[in-house]
């Protein structure tokens, strides 16, 4: 949990606590920041009221809106999301040597082999889920949205991983999910 003032400058932000980051209004819980990213079929600005009704403490937008909670206006919410998530989770990507695997075929196989070759100090993130010596969980997307991705990075770091073998989809590059990352390989 962080104060909103640790993430953004603004009057009164010292009194607002942030519990998490969400881009899906249906998943918002009290204290979350709701980031209004734009997707192929939906513009999350259209779901601000739903997010607020579920307890969003703040909304991040890239156009002027009227709402009953603090609003942070940025140039581009899709580009802002990985920066915000990195900061919220205390820059976990800086503690991982990330090995990114991209391509049409073979990403899962190559990422899995790399993780197994490196051993317990290496996590895996991709089609098979998020996997390390301390957890093994399914995920929805090969490369999740940044609100989830940086949460996973933090979990890998907290579990003792030094390396991460990660499938990187073209969609993730296109959607700015990987903008803030420096790949070692």
What is each model feature region?
Residues 81-185:
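Phosphate-binding loop of NTP-binding sites
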């Amino acid at each position: 949990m962080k104060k909103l003032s640790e993430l953004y400058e603004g009057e009164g932000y010292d009194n607002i606590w942030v519990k998490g980051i969400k881009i899906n209004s249906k998943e918002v819980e009290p204290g979350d920041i709701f980031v209004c990213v734009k997707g192929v079929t939906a513009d999350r600005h259209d779901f601000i009221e739903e997010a607020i009704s579920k307890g969003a403490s703040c909304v991040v937008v890239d156009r002027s809106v009227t709402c009953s909670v603090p609003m942070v206006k940025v140039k581009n919410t899709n580009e802002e999301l990985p920066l915000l998530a990195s900061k919220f989770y205390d820059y976990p990507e800086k503690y991982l040597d990330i090995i990114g695997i991209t391509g049409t075929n073979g990403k899962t196989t190559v990422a899995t082999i790399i993780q197994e070759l490196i051993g317990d100090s290496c996590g895996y993130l991709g089609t098979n889920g998020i996997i390390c010596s301390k957890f093994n969980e399914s995920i929805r997307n090969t490369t999740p949205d940044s609100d989830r991705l940086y949460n996973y990075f933090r979990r890998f770091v907290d579990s003792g991983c030094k390396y991460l073998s990660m499938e990187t989809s073209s969609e993730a590059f296109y959607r700015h999910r990987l903008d803030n990352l420096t790949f070692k390989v």
